[in-house]
A protein has these predicted regions:
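PLP-dependent aspartate aminotransferase-fold enzymes
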Residues: 90-190
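Single conserved hydrophobic/aromatic residue that forms the stacking wall/gate
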Residues: 199-211
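Glycine-rich loop-to-alpha-helix module at the N-terminal edge of alpha/beta enzyme cores
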Residues: 2, 42-128
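Active-site-adjacent loop/helix segments that line or gate small-molecule/cofactor pockets in enzymes
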Residues: 1-31
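Short, well-ordered beta-strand elements within core beta-sheets of diverse protein domains
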Residues: 34, 54-55, 168-169
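Active-site and channel-lining beta-strand-loop segments
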Residues: 24-45
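Alpha-helical transmembrane segments of integral membrane proteins
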Residues: 195-196
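Generic beta-strand/beta-sheet core signal
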Residues: 38, 191-192
Length: 211
């Protein structure tokens, strides 16, 4: 490790909030499936921004589209329509088979939106405020309070109690354990098809049963 990299890491440790255990490298650029640190060392990137950047680095179509949009407008808020959002929603509907699209900034925000949508739908149906959500043990859904509440790993939750209420947990790929938690108060079941924190993959037959 070069002295320059050591200096950057020391500065980061002093200035950045310690929310993650970071690897002792300072990244500089990417190309295809590879990343390079400031010393020029090459890494095969299996992380992809934690599964959010599957296109790789220096993807020409992506870069060209991004540069073209920057020259027009970067952000307008949801109070207005814009062409890229409309076109993206059309394409997402086509491949997903869903009726509507809701754009968010992060996975945690998407989970928060899903929790709110499920609870609001159930509330509008019967006026009750004690509906339950079933989540999976060993899951990870994000670091916001709602997402933490449906995260099935105590080590992420313990310092932030109390969580939001009426959350129950079952085991992935154990249909009976899910069924045991279902009551007339259940308004949603939240699960990952692949639990990255445990590398646990949902079996298609059990996923179909829950669906």
């Amino acid at each position: 490790m070069s002295d320059t990299m050591k200096e950057y890491i020391a500065e980061a440790e002093k200035d950045l909030l310690h929310t993650y255990n970071r690897y002792q490298i300072v990244l500089d650029k990417g190309d295809g499936v590879y990343l390079y640190d400031i010393d020029g060392k090459k890494y095969l990137d299996f992380v992809a921004g934690i599964a959010v950047f599957a296109l790789g680095y220096q993807n020409k179509a992506y870069n060209d589209a991004l540069k073209a949009q920057i020259d027009k407008v970067i952000h307008t808020s949801n109070y207005y329509y814009n062409v890229p959002a409309i076109e993206a929603a059309r394409k997402i509907k086509k491949v997903s088979g869903m009726d509507r699209v809701f754009f968010t900034n992060s996975g945690a925000e998407a989970v928060e939106g899903a929790i709110k949508a499920a609870r609001k739908y159930a509330y509008l149906k019967d006026g009750c405020t004690d509906h339950e959500i079933i989540a999976m043990n060993h899951s990870f859904h994000g670091r916001t309070m709602g997402a933490l509440s449906v995260t099935g790993n105590p080590k992420y939750r313990e310092a932030f109690q109390p969580m939001i209420g009426h959350i129950k947990f079952a085991d992935l790929n154990n249909f009976q354990s899910v069924l045991d938690q279902v009551t007339d108060k259940t308004c949603a079941i939240i699960m990952e098809t692949v639990q990255l924190s445990l590398i646990h993959i949902s079996e298609p037959t059990r996923l179909a049963l829950i669906s």
